[in-house]
Amino acid sequence: MTMFMACNPTSQLTEEAILIQNVSIIDPVNGLEQNKSVLIDRAKIVRIYEQSQAPELSGVSKIDGTNNYLMPGLWDAHVHYSFDENMRSEMNSLFLKYGITSVRDTGGPMDIVLQVKIASTRAEEISPSIYIAGPLIDGSPNVYNNSSPYYPLLSIENTDIQSIEENMGALVAEDLDFLKAYEMLTEPQFKALMKTANESELRVTGHIPLSMNLFSAVDNGLKGMEHLRNLEMSVAQNADELQEQRLEMLQNQEGLSGGALRSSIHAAQRMEAIAQLDSSKLLAAATLLAEEGVWQTPTLALYNNFATKEYLEDSAVEKLRVLPAEVSIAWSEAMKMSGSEIDPSTIAYVEWMRETVGYLNQNEVPFMAGTDTPIGFLIPGISLHRELELLVQSGLSNLEAIEAATIEPARFLGVERHTSRILEGYEADLILLRENPLENISATKEIEKVIKSGKVVPIEEF
């Protein structure tokens, strides 16, 4: 941008310029500001005016924002493009249709996720911004090993330190935005992973390895946790005893698959740990997570869906119409086969998750909003709005939930200085809402327009 343009941003506007007039803006840091006009051009927010001082700008496309609310486009910070190949080509349009303009892919084969990311940057593509972790970095036996449709190939198996070092060397040479550590890693493998990641300045999120506890994982540099996974085992009164038991079970004398072995350990320890929670250890964990800035992406919508069988409700079944026909049929059949019986222990686990989210938030632990779509019958886009509702029900304020779906994922990825805020010079990834989400978080579903890279997305065609 020339100096003249910088001083007078309306002097060199392109034919793609848009002026959103008389709108209330919701910035995740500054909150609500009313009576504004927002000028967009060249994929950026060029100028924010007081409505009374906004120029006429003849020839510029105008959007009447009266009684509307403009906020940054949403993030889904936990998605998997490679989980269902029949869904992959439809995910971008569904994300945009429901106001998700950026996503974090949290695990899949490099050849798939890298191509998805590359395709998203092509000029002719209308796509969310896509940030990728590459494959789940797992131990042996790895969980997502293509053993069934429920366990497609999302991970790489590491049998020893040498394989970790070799695989990490290859991964950090790729165009990755972060890394994801998984549950079957040994402690030495995890430490080797973190050493290479730290040297490469790549943040690592993941599941606390079953061989470890939360405190050791964070001390070694873990910067994110997905699903609160295995936190409860680290804050039980008998946490040390549970860890010794896990190390014994991880010897895998029965030769179980990675998925079966992990499930057996969860079944043996998860509810026992919750029943014997040590409040002092939980406080110590919350304090450490806050001090080290370890982001939590709890994916409450996923676990709530499993626990309550919410996906069997008529309103949820009706939403399947937005999916490709093949996927809609497959999901409908799988939903029916799952039955309608509610498992009390699963309900109890979800209640613990929600209580823990509220507790961690009170202790200033940072959060991101993510869903795990398309796993668990979670429709891309729609499911993120349910996640926001559940975050608020768990104790986050409406603004904190908005932060979790905007600026916090940007901060995790180090892009917060140019996206996910309503500020001049920031990317014009925006959603225009008919209602105020600060009053009712469900208003994020009341989408009037979606703007991606400064262009209005034709969501009515999706």
Model-predicted regions and their roles:
Residues 23, 38, 43, 67, ...:
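Divalent metal-coordination and catalytic microenvironments
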Residues 25-37, 51, 379-382, 397-402, ...:
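Acidic, glycine-enriched loop/beta-strand segments at the rims
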Residues 92-113, 127-134, 173-184, 202-205, ...:
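Divalent metal-dependent hydrolysis catalytic cores, especially in the metallo-beta-lactamase
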Residues 167-177, 231-389, 394:
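Active-site neighborhoods of metal-dependent hydrolases
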